[in-house]
Amino acid sequence: MIEFDNLSEKKDNQHITLENGNVFLTNYQTIVITVNCAGVMGKGIALQAKDLFPDAFLYYKDLCDKDKMHMGVPVLYNKRSNSLQTTDKEYKKLLLFPTKQHWKMPANIVSIEKGLQWLVDNYKKCGIKSLAIPALGCGNGGLEWRDVGPLLYKYLGKMNIPVQIFLPRQNIPKKHLTEKFLLTEPPKITDY
């Protein structure tokens, strides 16, 4: 875990930590699952989610088959299994977060930003009390942490709940893990 101490800019984002490891091992209430809109959970975090939560996969597949999974609009799935309770005895929630239209395509940072705004606007209404989120679009999506990190920090910093950001497995320069870097304004959507 990487926490930021003794930084004057840290006033608003004290609830965010950067984590190495497996997002599914968190004790946080809500886990973000990166998905596409084609109904396929074939690689990465999505495949792990399919194996761990087959009921969530069926729900997600049904949404895709009915054309109800859209870029920029995450969907909350309330897990109803006793095996995945959080420390406060609430059931896990899974937030299905589209990062790609089709599994063959790269991740879309414009839609990721729209989805993050949706999350900021709706997390209270959805009852999200703590959030574990991977580096959206990094890994199989082909995006770079240097672009995604500041974007995540910008939006998740607006949420008044504990947030764990799970870092991608790629080597990240140490300067891209600093508070100073993460507080920089992310690239404008028009830059893509």
Give, region by region, the residue ranges found by the protein language model:
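Macrodomain-like recognition of ADP-ribose-binding/processing modules
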Residues: 1-192
